[in-house]
Amino acid sequence: MNNKNLFKEMFFTLIPLILTNSLGILKYITNAFLVGNFLGGKAISVLSNTFPITLIFYAISIAFSTSISVLISKTFYNTENENNIINSKKIANNGYMFALITGIIVSFIIFIFDNLFLDILNTPNEILYDSRIFLLLFAVSFTPNFLQKNINESLRVLNKPNIPLIFVGINVILNNLLLYVLILNDFGIISIAIANIFSDILILLASYVYIRSHEVLKIDFSLFKIDRKIFKDISNIGLPIVFEQIIVSLIIFFETSISNLGGIICNSAFGIVGRWEEIFFVFSQSIQSLMIIYICRYYFTKDKTMIFRITINGIILSILPIVLFISIAFIFTDFACKIFLKNEDIISIAVKYFHIAGIAYCIMPIDMIFNGFIIGSAKTKFLFITNIIASISEIIIVVLLYKILNYDNMLALGCGIITYTLFTLLLNYIYYLKNVFTICKIEK
């Protein structure tokens, strides 16, 4: 395949990925808009306080869904193996079992340790009760959400990126309609959690109907049993991603705790910028997903010299998101923050913080390209090492600026986030170069 055709193929694969994630962004924006405008700053604070906790558990579902899809892709595209279809089906069905078992365990952990998690975050007493109820309801929606992610990621690597787009679109519409109705009926902040439960379950049922006719992903009860080797392979790829994401979540715990030191005003400002951080992350994740799809396809089919061309095309395709991030973080910052809340004191702090942390957000798409290479080539252990180094660096910078040099807590946080992103980008890039040169040497 020449580079022109490769770029065209990657471009048309990226479009449904971006559209899918854009619909997810729309869900975040409308959720925060409805909560902020109908329920106020206190409700936004509940979202920002529970976000680090929900992120940890969502990270588990993302990590294992990704590892399952990598294994399916690796097996399915290995046409030298005449049993590639049946082996892919075995992995898919074991993936469903893995998601179901893990989902139940995660829900149980949240039910038992919810108070401990909120104590670690220094959650203000004014929002403690609402935060706890929100977490308990989140636990109920986790398993169907995990199963749905599993199906979506597998469809993407099997060259069906449009189907997850449809599922996510319907989910967003259902979620926001339910949320609006629940808020109008005085359900308060728990409206988001309740809307998530019902919309996730309904979409999972729709997904089940679709995969019943799919060659690889349909549920086959003769294969619906634990295969220790497949579970081990899922764990070998997924666990380093889980640990990496747990480190990221713990850092967000740390960041949230620091923002809480400035009271609800600082925490609400942190929450507003946090909504945009989620949006930027989801856009960047589209680039990462694209890299995973193509690296999986070519890394395991011995056509490894394509990797460099895939990476260059990924960088070109990331230019538009970067320009968009720069516009929001540095040009239309005031407008972007006021979408969620009208309180001038909170907006003032949010804008200043956004101008600092925004530097890191603009680098994020490039960092995700190299992340995608590492995950797609199943070299996930390095992600764990990278994040340990970057996280320690961020903590050192924040403590140095806030505790020792007495800088403003939000300024310290922004500088810490920049430090973290620069370290992950540098280390991932070095690792990428090392592997590409090794691959090229082997090919010669």
Task: Report the location of each language-model feature.
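Juxtamembrane/transmembrane-helix interface segments of polytopic membrane transporters
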Residues: 24, 28, 32, 36, ...
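Transmembrane helix-bundle signature of multi-pass secondary active exporters and lipid flippases
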Residues: 15-70, 138-145, 232-300, 318-325, ...
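Hydrophobic alpha-helix feature that most strongly marks membrane-spanning transmembrane helices
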Residues: 247, 251, 255, 264, ...
